[in-house]
């Protein structure tokens, strides 16, 4: 049996049955039209906003019914369900024509709808639901269905969910005709920005950027301790920011890095977890950050470059923790590195392929220069296209370019169905005022305890993420959770970044961690074990959002000194947390030392500046005592450290309340003693480690 074609244009180029050729022709035609339309709009300006959104969504729906048929792959023979696929495709094409032809009467539908208008609205609603079910499964439909039922029967719900119900026709108008439902902000972002950047990512893949990132990462880190895993982290970060898909990143870079980690002795679950955590982090890594950053900029009414700047420190901290966790694991298990003679030379990689960084430089330069995000995307696409001509093997031939367009259209079709479903959720929530009721109810339950609101919000995001994409989780949280955080006084960008992180982290959160589940078969690992390892490695993603809610300086808000201090404190705390989870710092850590380091880590992470030095002392002291002394004598050291840290914490809090100079002197004396002891211990540890090194 011959292999199925990977693209519609490949099917058209070879000897294929007539039904397959017809399907491939339709997919190729719709995908090319879809990509060309958005590229034209990016260069010459988009048509009227509502028209652009409607054409975008209906063409995306048409592509979904072609590329995601029932009961088979698109390239397999037709079956009994093909008639439904054809019906969905035909209705989508008809809706495209209908919305374009009747655009002038769109505003009138807010107050009066004809029978044909009603049919078109119901058809749009049903097609969106079926498209989401085909591409993402039933989870988001269940969530959307709950909010629609609530809107219709709000007077039958208890507590904060009680309210006046919406009439069916009023709700239908809110979901389909209004600009706050299916054709609202999420679809607007998809049509204006996301398609162009996905096309940019497809063109980069065409010219070999993925292989270049892998070679560059391995040339830099392959020969170091834990080299393959570190290279996986770096390459996944670079590719993930372009692809915007954690699962897609796992399946591309992971296909190379995971088997290599396995051959060098890494546990299957750890290899899969490393790739999943790194690929997930690509979605929070500037400058592209996947689709969510564009949606966030739209909701916040901010420039995209402001979102990018705010994301730099949290993303750096996330990858720092994964990088260190991989290093600690390699040290703990005694895993080596790749021989240098088996690795590419960094200078040669950059000399031969460094030009592939040019499109990325165009994005950064365009954003810094203040160009519009659409113009930046168009320039980057042109740069990627031109770079393809440097090597004969990557020439952007017409077939390759059309395959890139097809890939971009397929990816966007799935995302657009998700955005439309999220629009249903938002429209249903605002049709009944549920958002306000939930906000007031949550604040009354949590009272003045912001941490409780954050815990409730994070848990909700994780539950929603069990089967929903990060974009869908974020958009749902915009309507449900973010108003709660804003009402509690959290800065707007911190509230939205909180939602972003917890929307992304669902990819590595058991029991349904989609990125880890995608990596597990490649590594031959148990999916649940892989998801647990991914969550451990990506623990920073659960902590960092809470940190920047309490310390907005981590989002570049505030004076430079505060930003530097908060970043340094967070980095030290997260390093201690990574070491505690792995069980290694400069030597293996015992359970008491790991517990002490967790306590010290959270003291450094806490927003009060007085706790930073105490937490650092506790974590560093625990590691030193554990490394320097035998198990029996170490218990005394751990106990003394714990008592000292508690005493300093109590004195510090009392001083903050009373401002007593005597307490201040006691605090300073204690901290000075501790710093001197830490310095002496560090010197002793350094001499001991140096003496063990071979000459």
Across the structure, where does each feature detected by a protein language model lie?
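Conserved, well-structured core domains of diverse proteins
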Residues: 1-111, 118-122, 674-690
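Long, contiguous bundles of hydrophobic transmembrane helices that form the permeation core
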Residues: 2-22, 32, 309-411, 514-605, ...
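Hydrophobic mid-bilayer segments of alpha-helices in multi-pass membrane transport proteins
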Residues: 27-31, 52-66, 84-93, 118-127, ...
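Transmembrane helix-loop boundary segments of multi-pass membrane transporters
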Residues: 44-54, 80-84, 109-113, 293-294, ...
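Membrane-interfacial loop-to-helix junctions in multi-pass transporters
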Residues: 115-119, 180-193, 220-232, 264-270, ...
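Core transmembrane alpha-helical segments of multi-pass membrane transporters/permeases
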Residues: 130, 135, 145-154, 160, ...
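Transmembrane alpha-helix interface/packing and boundary motifs in multi-pass membrane proteins
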Residues: 201-205, 236-245, 277-283, 367, ...
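Hydrophobic transmembrane alpha-helices that form the pore/transport pathway of multi-pass ion
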Residues: 214-282, 292, 301, 470-503, ...
């Amino acid at each position: 049996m011959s292999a199925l074609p990977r693209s519609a244009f490949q099917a058209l180029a070879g000897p294929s049955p007539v039904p397959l050729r017809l399907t491939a022709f339709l997919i190729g035609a719709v995908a090319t039209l879809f990509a060309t339309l958005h590229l034209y709009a990016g260069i010459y300006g988009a048509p009227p906003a509502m028209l652009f959104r409607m054409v975008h969504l209906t063409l995306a729906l048409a592509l979904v019914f072609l590329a995601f048929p029932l009961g088979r792959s698109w390239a397999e023979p037709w079956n009994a369900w093909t008639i439904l696929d054809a019906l969905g495709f035909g209705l989508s094409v008809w809706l495209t024509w209908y919305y374009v032809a009747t655009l002038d009467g769109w505003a009138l539908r807010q107050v009066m709808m004809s029978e044909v208008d009603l049919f078109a609205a119901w058809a749009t609603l049903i097609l969106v639901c079926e498209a989401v079910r085909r591409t993402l499964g039933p989870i988001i439909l269940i969530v959307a269905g709950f909010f629609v039922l609530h809107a219709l029967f709000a007077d039958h719900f208890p507590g904060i969910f009680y309210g006046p119900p919406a009439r069916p026709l009023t709700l239908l108008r809110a979901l389909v005709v209004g600009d706050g439902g299916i054709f609202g902000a999420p679809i607007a972002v998809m049509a204006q920005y996301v398609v162009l950047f996905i096309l940019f990512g497809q063109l980069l893949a065409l010219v070999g950027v993925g292989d270049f990132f892998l070679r560059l990462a391995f040339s830099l880190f392959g020969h170091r301790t834990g080299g393959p895993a570190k290279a996986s982290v770096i390459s996944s970060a670079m590719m993930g920011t372009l692809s915007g898909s954690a699962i897609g990143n796992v399946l591309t870079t992971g296909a190379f890095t995971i088997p290599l980690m396995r051959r060098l002795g890494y546990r299957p679950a750890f290899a899969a977890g490393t790739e999943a955590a790194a690929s997930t982090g690509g979605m929070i890594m500037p400058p592209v950050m996947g689709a969510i950053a564009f949606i966030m900029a739209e909701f916040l009414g901010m420039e995209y470059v402001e979102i990018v700047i705010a994301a730099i420190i949290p993303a750096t901290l996330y990858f720092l923790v994964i990088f260190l966790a991989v290093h600690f694991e390699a040290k703990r298990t005694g895993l080596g590195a790749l021989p240098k003679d088996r690795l590419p030379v960094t200078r040669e990689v950059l000399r031969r392929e460094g030009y592939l960084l040019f499109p990325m430089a165009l994005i950064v330069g365009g954003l810094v220069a203040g160009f519009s995000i659409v113009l930046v995307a168009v320039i980057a696409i042109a740069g990627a296209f031109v770079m393809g001509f440097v090597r004969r093997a990557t020439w952007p031939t017409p077939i390759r370019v059309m395959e890139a367009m097809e890939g971009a259209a397929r990816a966007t079709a799935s995302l657009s169905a998700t955005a439309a479903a999220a629009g249903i959720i938002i429209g249903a929530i605002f049709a009944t005022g549920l958002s306000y009721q939930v906000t007031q109810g949550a604040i009354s339950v949590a009272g003045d305890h912001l941490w409780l609101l954050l815990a409730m919000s994070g848990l909700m995001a994780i539950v929603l993420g069990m089967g929903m994409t990060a974009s869908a989780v974020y958009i749902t949280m915009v309507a449900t959770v973010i108003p709660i955080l804003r009402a509690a006084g959290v800065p707007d960008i911190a509230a939205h970044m909180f939602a972003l992180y917890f929307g992304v982290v669902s990819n590595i959160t058991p029991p349904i961690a989609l990125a880890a589940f995608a990596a597990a078969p490649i590594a031959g690992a148990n999916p649940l074990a892989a998801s647990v390892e991914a969550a451990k490695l990506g623990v920073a993603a659960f902590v960092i959002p809470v940190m920047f809610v309490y310390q907005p300086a981590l989002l570049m808000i505030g004076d430079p000194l505060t930003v530097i201090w908060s970043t340094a404190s967070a980095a030290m705390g997260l390093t201690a947390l990574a070491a505690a989870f792995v069980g290694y710092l400069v030597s293996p850590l015992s359970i008491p030392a790991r517990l002490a380091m967790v306590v010290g880590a959270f003291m450094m992470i806490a927003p009060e500046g007085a706790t930073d030095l105490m937490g650092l002392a506790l974590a560093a002291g625990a590691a030193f005592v554990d490394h320097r002394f035998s198990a029996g004598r170490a218990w005394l050291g751990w106990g003394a450290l714990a008592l000292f840290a508690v005493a300093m914490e109590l004195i510090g809090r009392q001083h903050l309340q009373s401002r007593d100079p005597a307490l201040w002197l006691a605090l300073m004396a204690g901290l000075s003693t501790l710093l001197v002891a830490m310095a002496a211990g560090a010197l002793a540890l350094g001499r001991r480690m140096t003496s063990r090194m071979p000459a």
